[in-house]
């Protein structure tokens, strides 16, 4: 009673489908399990059924979900779904007791002379499969598995519903079965095509079909072609388009275009109001223009360049000027041909409606009459046997192994990442952005018209009219203006920081100038990055590579060419990478790491390398000179005190201090001002003034040894210049480096410094003896 009441009161019938597909073999030990019921199932598939779009959407979504988690691209999922649909439906009969039936089995009885699966619950739990099975002959079936024919490679990620622990020989073909409420009929195929066309073009579908035929061979080609024709097999002819129907289509399209515009103002309101007014005045003219082919190139009658530039900005139209009159999707005004992007044909036609147009006499007669014949010829070319049999190797029929990815969200994309990390083997390098140069389009407010007389007529489009510098946030903005750009301008912005800082800088800039709107996204035309190689024991070896490096005379660094980008290497393992960002930057870093790893006798202190890279990632900034020296000598002192056997304990101590924030620092207090955006603050001359220290009445820069100088470099400078006071401490440090390092250069250099200190001690002792004798 309760069930009948619930069925009567249910207003919308639910078609919720379980998307969990399973794998069932169609060949077992040379037995074809599908042959017995193929004819009867074909009759069932071909019968007319009631069409429910909700049910069809659920079925095709379950087919999409069978692609597996490793196929993340929707287009690839659509291709795998298409391949399964081309191989077509398949059914496998079986005998099963009622208490063992689940929702993958459909009740259906056939008398089978050939093989029938007898399935029963897997009580042994030898695997995750639901059923065990045996093969019977001359018996009737009680239930049936229904799904789509597939290949073993496509179903490698799907769980088997039958236990195959015993020695069972199969075939490359298998079945992807779905729950019994996801039945597939041939009447659904044209509707499946509508769903596939959301992600695939007709050319993609044809190429995928050709590749599948070439991959599987001629034996299955007829089966694939039949299901391919069923996809395009609408029985009912589409109704003829009437004027009222075209009016509805046009109104709907205008509404879609209106909502696709990101920002509305007086410019966009005027554009759509004029289109609507002309549609009310002359519907025939507007509808004819709306369907105008891209091959026809009309001429605009009245044209306002200032208004047109604002429309292209706010409507996000991609327009180029050309001189050829044979380019599609274009219109001309005077002698200038304006070409829009091939995907913006509707916008081209709306611009023609807005400004009005005329056609040449030969264009009116020739191009419109030959339009249908051109389409017919293209269809014949596309369906020709030669192009139909072409094989495209870009699409693979093997599903990649599943790897769970956790992508880091970066506002603005990878081009605006503050840090770019690349790992090769055990070596990791962190590249930090020092500054970016971006180009942005902007619309000016109406106040610009009061200063038009100040703009000289001799200006060109590449002339910098204004250059403004801001201290907070620190950026430099160069404005390019020409004598015909009174409403728009191009901005060249030099700034450092993430995407949020860039948006904040645009807001600050807008407060000081007559900018009405910025048009994002911005184009990053140049990006400079800096990196440090941590833990490198012999830092000079990076600048001694052959074949891939060369020196320049007017700049104190070595240039290494990687991916056609000059990577500059300073002393102490510090590098700079110009021009590139995002994925290109990662490729350059990886090539450079591979090149460095091929250097013979190169040695890294991997514990120190891991600690310093972790400190960089924690602070999202390069480690300053003083903090790094304090960190390295604190660790070196602990290693000397605890001994080499307690090296892991020292590593955990330093790791604990990093995690507790003992070595955290502020980005604004970095001593090396070269990595700050100082050029925008005080100019390039004062930007090179690095803070200095006074030692023995001499001024020295804090980074005179290099920001990334290691312990051996600092000890060499102190010992050779005699800046030490407690020799015992320096001897212990040098002895530890000489005995623990695996690098021959470090051992030799440490022993040399020890001998230098020993000889210096003898010299001082002999001078004291002579002084005592004289007294």
UniProtKB/Swiss-Prot annotation:
Pfam families: DUF587 (PF04532), Herpes_UL87 (PF03043). The gene is U58. It comes from the Viruses. Belongs to the herpesviridae UL87 family. It comes from Human herpesvirus 7 (strain JI) (HHV-7). InterPro entries: Herpes_UL87_C, Herpes_UL87_N. This is Protein U58.
